[in-house]
């Protein structure tokens, strides 16, 4: 059963990884004509983009800038809606994926798609929900109606930065929770990590211009809970492996796809230093990823910090 209220469209998806492939299935199920472009394969990008009404970027963070530049060189009509579905931060300019796309296409309708969306569950037909956020409400509604179904519910938001940062920042906290579970520290410790992790996300997001209340929604708390409570989460898997005492290189080699939190942590630490934001959990995750501490030492530092109000 189709629940979208838009006529069939052509949707181009950049990135053939787990998330890009899942989005393609969702769009095809709604009767749209979908073409997926993978930069590792010999596909004509111009042909993929031609006639598309919606362009979804689901490439890894490392691929966002080069792919955006290739698309800019090919060119797209001004009415094409750009959708950013990547969760990461640019390590050089400290930008979000949507900010990179926005800089490359300043006059294009731009939408952020984010939420608690584990690809494997969606591909199994299990129900899920997400948020499409944009300063252009019309664009957000177009994407909402194009992709929503009886198994994939979409909400709109006018806070694209908050929606995007929620999906980005929770990846680092998920690594911490994975470590916690590997050390068998219990439910109390896990609850404390998730709750204080959300507080860190809100501090960073609000300082950067996002609305604090956005982080209490699907793209913030919702995504945080899904990522921290599922062994399907790559970031959780990284933390669990580190908590078992395995080297990061080995853990990453055994994971399918990209654990963006590994590359997000140092960027968040840099942003926090620039803006004087307290991010103790993220700092300990960063030290652990750099091999500068052990899981037990990181825990001790978190527990022995100066006492303060919540």
Swiss-Prot record:
Q: What is its main location?
A: cytoplasm
Which EC class is the enzyme in? oxidoreductase
Q: Where in the cell is it found?
A: Cytoplasm
Q: In what pathway does it function?
A: Membrane lipid metabolism; glycerophospholipid metabolism
Q: Which GO terms describe its cellular component?
A: cytosol
Q: What EC number(s) would the UniProt record show?
A: 1.1.1.94
Keywords, ordered alphabetically: Cytoplasm, Lipid biosynthesis, Lipid metabolism, NAD, NADP, Nucleotide-binding, Oxidoreductase, Phospholipid biosynthesis, Phospholipid metabolism
Any one Pfam family match given in the protein's UniProt record, by short name = NAD_Gly3P_dh_C
Q: Which GO biological process categories is it annotated with?
A: carbohydrate metabolic process; glycerol-3-phosphate biosynthetic process; glycerol-3-phosphate catabolic process; glycerophospholipid metabolic process; phospholipid biosynthetic process
Which positions bind sn-glycerol 3-phosphate? 87, 115, 170, 223, 233-235
Coiled-coil portions: none
Q: Does the keyword Protease apply?
A: no
Which is one GO molecular function term here? Answer: NAD binding
Cite the binding residues for NADPH.
Answer: 19, 39-40, 87, 119, 234, 260
Could you tell me what reaction this enzyme catalyses? sn-glycerol 3-phosphate + NAD(+) = dihydroxyacetone phosphate + NADH + H(+); sn-glycerol 3-phosphate + NADP(+) = dihydroxyacetone phosphate + NADPH + H(+)
Active-site residues annotated for this sequence: 170 (proton acceptor)
Family according to the record: Belongs to the NAD-dependent glycerol-3-phosphate dehydrogenase family.
State its role: Catalyzes the reduction of the glycolytic intermediate dihydroxyacetone phosphate (DHAP) to sn-glycerol 3-phosphate (G3P), the key precursor for phospholipid synthesis.
Q: What is this protein called?
A: Glycerol-3-phosphate dehydrogenase [NAD(P)+]
């Amino acid at each position: 059963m189709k629940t979208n209220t838009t006529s069939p469209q052509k949707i181009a998806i950049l990135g053939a990884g787990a998330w890009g492939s899942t989005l393609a299935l969702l769009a095809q199920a709604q009767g749209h004509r979908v073409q997926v472009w993978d930069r590792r394969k010999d596909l004509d990008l111009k042909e993929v983009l031609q006639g598309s009404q919606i362009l979804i970027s689901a490439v890894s963070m490392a691929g966002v800038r080069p792919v955006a530049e290739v698309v800019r060189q090919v060119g797209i009509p001004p009415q094409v809606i750009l959708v950013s579905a990547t969760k990461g931060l640019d390590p050089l300019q400290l930008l979000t994926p949507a900010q990179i796309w926005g800089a490359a296409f300043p006059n294009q309708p731009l939408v952020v798609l984010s939420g608690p969306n584990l690809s494997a569950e969606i591909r199994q037909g299990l129900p899920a929900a997400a948020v499409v956020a944009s300063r252009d409400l019309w664009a957000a509604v177009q994407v909402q109606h194009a992709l929503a179904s009886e198994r994939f519910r979409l909400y709109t938001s006018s806070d694209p930065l908050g929606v995007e940062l929620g999906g980005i920042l929770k990846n680092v906290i998920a690594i911490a929770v994975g470590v916690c579970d590997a050390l068998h520290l219990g439910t109390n410790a896990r609850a404390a990590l998730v709750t204080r992790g959300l507080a860190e996300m809100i501090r960073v997001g609000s300082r950067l211009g996002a609305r604090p209340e956005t982080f209490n929604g699907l793209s913030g708390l919702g995504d945080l809970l899904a990522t921290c409570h599922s062994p399907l989460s790559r970031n959780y898997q990284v933390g669990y492996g580190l908590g078992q005492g395995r080297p990061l290189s080995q853990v990453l080699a055994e994971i399918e796809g990209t654990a963006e939190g590994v590359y997000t942590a140092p960027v968040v630490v840099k942003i926090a230093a620039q803006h004087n934001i307290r991010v103790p959990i993220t700092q300990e995750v960063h030290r652990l990823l750099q091999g500068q501490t052990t899981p037990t030492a990181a825990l001790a530092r978190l527990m022995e910090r100066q006492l303060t109000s919540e």
